[in-house]
Amino acid sequence: MPVVTRHSGFDAPLDRVWNVVSDPYSLPRWWPRVQRVEEVSDSGWTMVLLSDRGKPIRADYTLAESRPMQLLEWNQELEESPFERMLSQSKIVIELAENEDSGSTAVVLRSTERLRGLARLGSPMVRRAAGRRLSQALERLGELVE
């Protein structure tokens, strides 16, 4: 089960970072490939992603856990989705911690994807792609909050 973690520190107050990462409508501004977000509720939303070929792909997420100013966990709903054939589990965890001395914020992004069937053979590729996605997300998040 590929688990990939990336972390960074931002010269931005915790509440500014939290306001961005906790708002699904801000995802197109910082999460890679997200074109727009639809059907937002307190418990979930749909990301419309752009494939490598330029086609839109819908990915439904639920908010599994939220501790204000500390942690968010998103679970991707895989049943009856284009991702169901390859994945049996997919989740993203966002952890935040404030450095009270400097006023900066540490951000940890963690992606967990459990592959299904023969797709398990692609684990190294999935891990690399997840690492690129998380690194891009951190870079874009930094541009927004700093």
Q: Where on the chain are the PLM-derived regions?
A:
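Hydrophobic-ligand-binding modules of eukaryotic lipid transfer/binding families
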Residues: 1-9, 47, 91, 135, ...
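Solvent-exposed residues in well-ordered beta-strands and their adjoining turns
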Residues: 9-13, 50-52, 64-66, 77, ...
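Short, intrinsically disordered, mixed-charge
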Residues: 19-32, 127, 131, 139, ...
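Beta-strand/loop substructures that line and gate deep hydrophobic ligand-binding cavities in soluble
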Residues: 79-136, 143
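Hydrophobic/aromatic beta-strand elements that line small-molecule binding cavities or substrate pockets
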Residues: 6-8, 58-65, 88-98
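Glycine-rich portal/gate segments that line the openings of hydrophobic small-molecule binding cavities
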Residues: 38-85, 106, 139-146
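Hydrophobic ligand-binding cavity/cleft-lining segments
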Residues: 1-42
